Amino acid sequence: MWRLTGILGRALPRLLGPGFRGITPKPTSSDGPQTTSTTLPLPRVNFDRSGSHGSKRNRDPKCCGWKEAFHWMSAHVSPNTLRDAVSWGTLAVLALHLARQIHFHAPLVAGPQSAERCSWHSPLYRFLSSSWWHPHSSLRRHVLPSPDCPAPRNTGLREPRLGQEEPAARSQGLPSDSSLKPGLLNLPEEEPSDFGFLNASRDFTSQAKAAEAGPPGGKNEQDKPKALPLEEAVTSIQQLFQLSVAIAFNFLGTENIKTGDYTAAFSYFQKAADRGYSKAQYNVGLCLEHGRGTPRDLSKAVLFYHLAAVQGHSLAQYRYARCLLQSPGSMSDPERQRAVSLLKQAADSGLTEAQAFLGVLFTKEPHLDEQKAVKYFWLAASNGDSQSRFHLGICYEKGLGVQRNLGEAVKCYQKSAAMGNEPAQERLRTLFNVEAAGPSHLAIGLKSFSSPSLCSLNTFLAGASGLPHASSTGNLGLLCRSGHLGTSHGAPSRAMPSLERSLVRLGFG
């Protein structure tokens, strides 16, 4: 509405007709003569008229004149004329706004080339910015934006233009008449970073489309496996169903192991293993190896261990490799290397049993490697295996794979003894008995370590006997002769955890 004032000031006098212009309202006083003025248009009224009407009243002549003019206009001008004037003025304003909107949105529809032609230097702009229009003209001020306000830019919607095309387009769009230069708007140039970003995005999009298109032959090859999505979905559902059933059977087997029904447990493990479940295959191998719920058959146990090991089950890899290495000497070198490779995979996955077994294995021929033995002893000891800590102490005492260090050896023995390892406790007693018997080279080394006295050592060992301890592999030679894992010379009372505990603990992991 604020733009209507300037438009109506010029449209209203022209639309009311020539007879209305220059006429002043008729005075209401009866004794004053009527005067006319043909020089002043509405809404200004001539107040220099004779008569006693103007001198007798103490009113503002300007306010009185406007009021009389309004009454005269209401009396002599029909309402239709005023309505037409307002309507035509409103239509003119709407037409100018519509032209301006069309002028702004034309580049969006026409594209980059049309955007150059439909720029701010259009015929409408050149017409309104010509020299014969006053700079403060109401029509020009209301239609064209002010120089302080930047020209509207739709950078997010317009096509980006190349930097080489901009100067030429701008030079063509500028008018040649020098008189138009003072009235032209200073259009802010678009930042080159915006163009660089949009061009980079467009290039990236085009490269991505080109990469997706690719050679026609490769695209057809990629589409071939996706020809039967329904069959693939059905197969996936069947596999999920089989896996769910296998998990349920394996769970039932572990529950029957807890209750002591080994026959039913082995039956459930067998059903789950037939569906390819690696944990159930490992449990079947345990039952066959120890003869729980089925006659003992080591060859079948090795077969099921192998099936689970192929699927990446670390415990199955360890037991399968251990069974191969414990077999008679008829095993070929490729099979032996394969067993060692499986042990390394299980040890690298963090399995403590495999790390301890490899440490013992690398102390024997034909796999003798003292440095690797120390490495795997240290890994297993870091994971809490007391027997590997004891073996690491032997390496420090004898200088196997490491520099001989009696102080570190005693540290390892003490840590292993604190975890309840009986061979480590016996070794510590032997060392301190030698120290108490008389000075020797060994005693000098022990004194430098500042070891505790025998009384305090006995008290310490008595308190440590009740601590929890981890099972270990023991000596490899004893393991091959006895066939049981976790026993060692000097510790006959220590045994491997029961099968029931192994199944419950390992049935899901």
Curated annotation (Swiss-Prot):
InterPro entries membership: ISR_Activator, Sel1-like, TPR-like_helical_dom_sf
Protein name: DAP3-binding cell death enhancer 1
PANTHER family, per the entry: DAP3-BINDING CELL DEATH ENHANCER 1
TPR repeats: 213-245, 246-278, 279-313, 314-351, 352-385, 386-423, 470-498
Cellular component, GO, one term: mitochondrial inner membrane
Family: Belongs to the DELE1 family.
UniProt key word rRNA-binding: no
Biased composition (Polar residues): 26-40
Propiece span(s): 24-101
Residues annotated as site: Cleavage: H142, V143
Keyword set, alphabetical order: Apoptosis, Cytoplasm, DNA damage, Membrane, Mitochondrion, Mitochondrion inner membrane, Mitochondrion outer membrane, Repeat, TPR repeat, Transit peptide, Ubl conjugation
Positions of short motif SIFI-degron: 307-326
Residue interval of the organelle targeting sequence: 1-23
Domain statement: The TPR repeats bind to and activate EIF2AK1/HRI.
Cross-referenced SMART domains: SEL1
Assembly and oligomerization: Interacts with DAP3.
Protein function: Protein kinase activator that acts as a key activator of the integrated stress response (ISR) following various stresses, such as iron deficiency, mitochondrial stress or mitochondrial DNA breaks. Detects impaired protein import and processing in mitochondria, activating the ISR. May also required for the induction of death receptor-mediated apoptosis through the regulation of caspase activation.
Any one GO molecular function term: protein serine/threonine kinase activator activity
Basic and acidic residues composition-biased segments: 46-60, 156-168
Source organism of this protein record: Rattus norvegicus
Residue span of region Disordered: 19-60, 143-185
GO biological process: cellular response to stress; DNA damage response; extrinsic apoptotic signaling pathway via death domain receptors; HRI-mediated signaling; integrated stress response signaling; positive regulation of mitophagy; response to iron ion starvation
Annotated disulfide bonds: none
